């Protein structure tokens, strides 16, 4: 019997009633991972021994009836630090790195007796939108194994979509949770910047990065956010604002809610069938009692350019620490210190990472800083102001998560600009530090379409309220790929 169709609440009831044990649930999850892994390639590391040891310890002390997550397995993106479990960021540079500490998000999960079952595949150092830049493998879309799963958190999305695990963690710098969630038909949230501690997250773009949850349903996503969200003195950007329970508004109606639909989100570059899906969703929200009106976010068209200057600049600084001296990969053909640096970084980083380091170094260089990095920061402010103006009159923003459904493997990975443009709808949310969710909203050519809901800072509970209301009157979240046991 597989438990992957059970919700977290249903699994919790079984555990409390002792109809299953944490060990049995963990063993079954490991079986589900192994039986599907060859098809989708979600994991870099499966921590079988450690997970079973942890499950046995939980069984020994007993399941806490008041702790929903007690004994529940969790998959973790491989750029989030896990003590004594390989954390590679999908890079040759860190192919053998075992951290000596847990990320705060992981420590929070352990504190709730969650079981880290393994580390998921991703684009190298989270730089990519297809999980094809990984040093280890290419992950495949759960619905069509000839398509990409999205990125950079592709493994975390396919692990949930394929029924390997119920819950997973990813990170989102420019859409890296929401895009793969959309491509795989699951729920993925990028929280408000600072809601989840970045301590232990291998840094890419420090002003943009945020850890967030994947789950099959809106409520389970909120339940996982309840676990990982916390203020943290180890992260200077951690926010003190906290919602006691992110599920608190789920189940409430949305009558009177005002939702904005930016005309730019349905314009050039958006697949016509994606546009139709979003407009149908807008009508569904109106049927639920919300008001949906067209607005404008005029500076969003500059988002991709601004993002790739800022994110690459921050990456070029953050990745200086990988030099072959302290830990990780070191080139063995170096004759002096300079050659250690040059050869290690040349051999240890993949092409996309090196491309972004070079772009960022150029943007920060003398003579170009004002023309590129400084100007990008100024336009970022204009993008933030656009959102502020809309949220002065509206509760949420609605739009597609991605301009297309999942594209084919090996189709865009040799065209960086085309790959970058795939994030045009998610990037502005990171630039503004806002919360955004992707939920299943339909299918085009048999592939899932994601609907994005964006809110002002610290309004995750309102986003979940609206997302759950839509989910309650649709069945897209119930449809599953063949690999999960569905008929698609």
Curated annotation (Swiss-Prot):
Catalytic residues in the record: 77, 152, 176
The domain of life is Bacteria
Q: Which cysteines are joined by disulfide bonds?
A: none
Which is one Gene Ontology cellular component term of this protein? glutamyl-tRNA(Gln) amidotransferase complex
- SUPFAM superfamilies per the record? Amidase signature (AS) enzymes
What broad class of enzyme is this? ligase
| Keywords per UniProt | ATP-binding, Ligase, Nucleotide-binding, Protein biosynthesis
Q: What is its EC number?
A: 6.3.5.7
Coiled-coil region: none
Query: What is an annotated GO biological process for this record, any one?
Result: translation
Q: Identify a single GO molecular function assigned to this protein.
A: ATP binding
Q: Does the keyword Transferase apply?
A: no
Q: Enumerate the catalysed reactions.
A: L-glutamyl-tRNA(Gln) + L-glutamine + ATP + H2O = L-glutaminyl-tRNA(Gln) + L-glutamate + ADP + phosphate + H(+)
Q: Give the InterPro entries listed for this entry.
A: Amidase (IPR000120), Amidase_CS (IPR020556), Amidase_dom (IPR023631), AS_sf (IPR036928), GatA (IPR004412)
Name the Pfam families for this protein.
Amidase
What role is this protein assigned?
Allows the formation of correctly charged Gln-tRNA(Gln) through the transamidation of misacylated Glu-tRNA(Gln) in organisms which lack glutaminyl-tRNA synthetase. The reaction takes place in the presence of glutamine and ATP through an activated gamma-phospho-Glu-tRNA(Gln).
Entry's family note: Belongs to the amidase family. GatA subfamily.
Task: Kindly give the NCBIfam families that the UniProt entry links to this protein.
Answer: gatA (TIGR00132)
How is the quaternary structure described? Heterotrimer of A, B and C subunits.
This one is known as Glutamyl-tRNA(Gln) amidotransferase subunit A
What organism does the record attribute this protein to? Streptococcus pyogenes serotype M49 (strain NZ131)
């Amino acid at each position: 019997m597989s438990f992957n169709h059970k919700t977290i609440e249903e699994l919790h009831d079984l555990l409390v009633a002792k109809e299953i044990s944490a060990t049995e649930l963990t063993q079954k999850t490991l079986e589900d991972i192994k039986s599907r892994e060859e098809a989708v390639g979600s994991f870099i590391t499966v921590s079988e021994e450690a997970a079973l040891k942890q499950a046995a310890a939980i069984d020994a002390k007993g399941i806490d009836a008041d702790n929903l997550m007690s004994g529940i397995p969790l998959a973790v993106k491989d750029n989030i630090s896990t003590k004594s479990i390989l954390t590679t960021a999908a890079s040759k540079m860190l192919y053998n790195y075992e951290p000596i500490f847990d990320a705060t998000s992981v420590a929070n999960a352990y504190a709730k007796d969650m079981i880290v079952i393994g580390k998921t595949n991703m684009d190298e150092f989270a730089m990519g939108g297809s999980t094809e830049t990984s040093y280890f493998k290419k992950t495949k879309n759960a619905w069509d194994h000839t398509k990409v799963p999205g990125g950079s958190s592709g493994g975390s999305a396919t692990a949930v979509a394929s029924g390997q695990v119920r819950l997973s963690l990813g990170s989102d710098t420019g859409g890296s949770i929401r895009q793969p969630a959309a491509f795989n038909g699951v729920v993925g949230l990028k929280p408000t910047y600072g809601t989840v501690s970045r301590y232990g997250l291998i840094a890419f773009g420090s002003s943009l990065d945020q850890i967030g949850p994947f789950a099959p349903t809106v409520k389970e996503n909120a339940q996982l956010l309840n676990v990982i969200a916390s203020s943290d003195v180890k992260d200077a950007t951690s926010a003190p604002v906290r919602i006691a329970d992110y599920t608190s508004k789920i189940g409430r109606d949305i009558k009177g809610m005002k939702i904005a639909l930016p005309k730019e989100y349905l314009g050039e570059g958006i697949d016509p069938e994606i546009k139709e899906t979003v407009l149908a969703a807008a009508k569904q929200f109106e049927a639920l009692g919300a008001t949906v009106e067209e607005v404008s976010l005029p500076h969003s068209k500059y988002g991709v350019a601004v993002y790739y200057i800022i994110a690459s600049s921050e990456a070029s600084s953050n990745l200086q620490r990988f030099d072959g001296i302290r830990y990780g990969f070191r080139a063995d053909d170096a004759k002096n210190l300079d050659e250690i640096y040059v050869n290690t970084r040349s051999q240890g980083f993949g092409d996309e990472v090196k491309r972004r380091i070079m772009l960022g170094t150029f943007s920060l260089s003398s003579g170009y800083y004002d023309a590129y990095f400084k100007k990008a920061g100024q336009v970022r402010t204009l993008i933030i102001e656009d959102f502020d103006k809309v949220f002065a009159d509206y509760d949420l923003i609605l739009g597609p998560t991605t301009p297309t459904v999942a594209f084919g493997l090996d189709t865009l990975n040799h065209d960086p600009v085309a790959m970058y443009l795939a994030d045009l709808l998610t990037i502005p949310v990171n630039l503004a530090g806002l919360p955004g969710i992707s939920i299943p909203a339909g299918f085009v050519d048999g592939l899932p379409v994601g609907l994005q809901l964006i809110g002002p800072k610290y309004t995750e509970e309102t986003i979940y309220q609206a997302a759950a209301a839509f989910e309650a009157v649709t069945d897209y979240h119930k449809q599953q790929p063949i690999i999960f046991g569905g008929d698609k």
